[in-house]
Design a protein with these regions (language model features):
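GST-like domain detector, emphasizing the conserved glutathione-binding G-site
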Residues: 4-115, 233, 243, 252, ...
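GST-like fold's C-terminal all-alpha helical module
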Residues: 88-198
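Short gly/pro-enriched beta-turn/loop segments at secondary-structure junctions
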Residues: 161-163, 233-236
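Histidine- and/or cysteine-centered catalytic micro-motif in compact active-site loops
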Residues: 171, 209, 244
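Mixed-charge, Lys/Arg-rich low-complexity intrinsically disordered regions
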Residues: 201-235
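A short beta-strand micro-motif
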Residues: 238-244
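Phosphate-binding active sites in nucleotide-utilizing proteins
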Residues: 247
Length: 289
């Protein structure tokens, strides 16, 4: 299980959505996953029929649209909670990785370092010397969390948990690999950690990759997308999407949806038939293919 997919598990449990889990390899290649995504190999990926959602940001948006209540963005923060979640899942997450893995780099095999170096630029020889800085940055960010909870609020937004809490929690859990336990940050953080942990991961059923692929083939994408004017692309154009990271993987398909929030590509594979692959606009490089 990827540490990042815990965010989505918590979202599903919070919304009381029954879901199916397909295990994917930690290290590339991931051939069955690529059948559905077209080459995107990061975790998590969510499938609803023949619609495939790549990246936590677009998955949470899809879950919020599918089951609006209880919201992942409770008042009074509302959508500002997404900005906190994006910070927690990107800037703070990398420092959490330093705090978690740097203290004991042998906890993961050499194949892991090779894979992460190729895909994310996370090379052992440059990562490990930066560990002291990342550890300091992790604790600095943890202090922000501690300060936010110091007024007695049960969750970041107040009385209800949401995406921001789940993304922040992943970092506190990640560093437990290095023996950094929640109580180190004080009672407010430890209690917050325990409240979120009690949410669990919902109604989960294990599924095979073949079952997921067959399910996509037996359904059709929902559709109804459009390409907004003034974005530099046209509906029906062949395009490629890749992340802003060093990861060379690209997904190529027919552009069917584009706005300031999302990118949607239509593509086909003999095993899954036609699927629509969804990406967030943030963090993705869109180019003509």
């Amino acid at each position: 299980m990827c540490i990042r997919d815990r965010i989505i598990r918590l979202c599903l449990a919070h919304k009381d959505i029954a879901w199916k889990s397909v295990e994917a390899p930690v290290i590339t290649p991931k051939p069955d996953l690529s059948v559905l995504t077209g080459g995107y190999e990061r975790i998590p990926v969510m499938q609803i029929g023949a619609d495939i959602y790549c990246d936590t940001d677009i998955i949470t948006a899809a879950l919020e649209a599918h089951t609006p209540e209880p919201s992942l963005y409770p008042a009074p923060l509302g959508s500002a909670g997404k900005m906190i979640a994006l910070w927690a899942a990107n800037s703070w997450f990398m420092n959490s990785a330093g705090a978690a893995l740097g203290a004991n780099p042998d906890i993961v095999p050499e194949e892991f370092w090779e894979d992460r170096g190729r895909r994310f630029g996370m090379k052992r020889e440059t990562f490990l010397p930066a560990v002291p800085h990342m550890q300091a940055q992790f604790h600095g960010a943890a202090q922000l969390l501690k300060d936010a909870l110091a007024d007695g609020r049960p969750y970041i937004a107040g009385d209800a948990p949401g995406h921001a809490d789940f993304a922040l929690l992943v970092n506190i859990r990640f560093v437990q690999f290095a023996g950094i336990l929640p109580n180190i940050f004080g009672d407010a953080v430890a209690d917050w950690h325990d409240r979120l942990g009690a949410i669990g991961e919902g109604d989960r059923e294990a599924w095979t990759a073949d079952a997921a692929i067959d399910h996509a083939r037996a359904t059709a994408p929902v559709g109804g997308h459009s390409v907004a004017d003034g974005k530099g692309f046209e509906a029906g154009q062949t395009v490629s999407v890749k992340t802003e990271s060093p990861d060379p993987a690209k997904v190529t398909g027919t552009l069917v949806g584009l706005d300031d929030r999302t990118i949607v590509l239509a593509r086909e594979h003999e095993r899954c038939g036609e699927v629509h692959v969804h990406f967030p606009r943030l963090g993705q490089i869109l180019t003509p293919a």
